[in-house]
């Protein structure tokens, strides 16, 4: 399997998870928050993770698609971009999330932070920067802003509403 096939498969897997999770209470509640781009990204992120069937990246103990896929898909749709742009942005965000999660593992998790929420926020910024064709300085700024807004305490584990919210709000930041 080529790298492109792996990314396409991971994105399709996330879409299947989002479809399966769309009827869950946490996903329905997220959809009721509004219909702006950020609210739609948050709702899609919640649906994609609420059943916890999405990808798990063990070297960084994170779900890489949960924050990045909804951000890439919905921003690209908003901008009228094609599937190639979605896939390129998704790949960039997926790799950034994985690299950060791997670099912070296991310390990030052991100190009470959830790598998906923290690292995925930056990965989503990378995906968005790619779609918006930001230059390197603008991309750095977008990542810095995302990191300032990142959160994700492990204390929320076991909560039907809070845990999917971390994944979904990472997409929207």
Q: Which residue stretches match the model-derived regions?
A:
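N-terminal core-entry segment
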Residues: 1-173
């Amino acid at each position: 399997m080529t790298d492109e096939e792996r990314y396409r498969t991971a994105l399709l897997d996330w879409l299947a998870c989002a479809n399966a999770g769309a009827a869950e209470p946490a996903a329905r509640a997220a959809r009721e928050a509004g219909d702006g781009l950020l609210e739609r990204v948050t709702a899609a992120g919640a649906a994609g993770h609420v059943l916890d069937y999405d990808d798990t990246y063990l070297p960084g103990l994170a779900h890489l698609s949960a924050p990045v896929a909804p951000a890439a898909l919905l921003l690209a749709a908003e901008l009228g971009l094609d599937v190639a742009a979605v896939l390129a942005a998704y790949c960039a965000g997926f790799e950034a999330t994985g690299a950060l999660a791997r670099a912070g593992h296991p310390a990030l998790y052991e100190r009470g932070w959830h790598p998906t929420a923290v690292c995925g926020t930056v990965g989503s910024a990378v995906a968005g920067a790619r779609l918006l064709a930001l230059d390197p300085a603008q991309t750095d700024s977008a990542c810095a802003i995302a990191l300032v807004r990142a959160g994700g305490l492990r204390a929320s584990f076991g909560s039907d509403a809070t845990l999917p919210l971390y994944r979904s709000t990472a997409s929207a930041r």
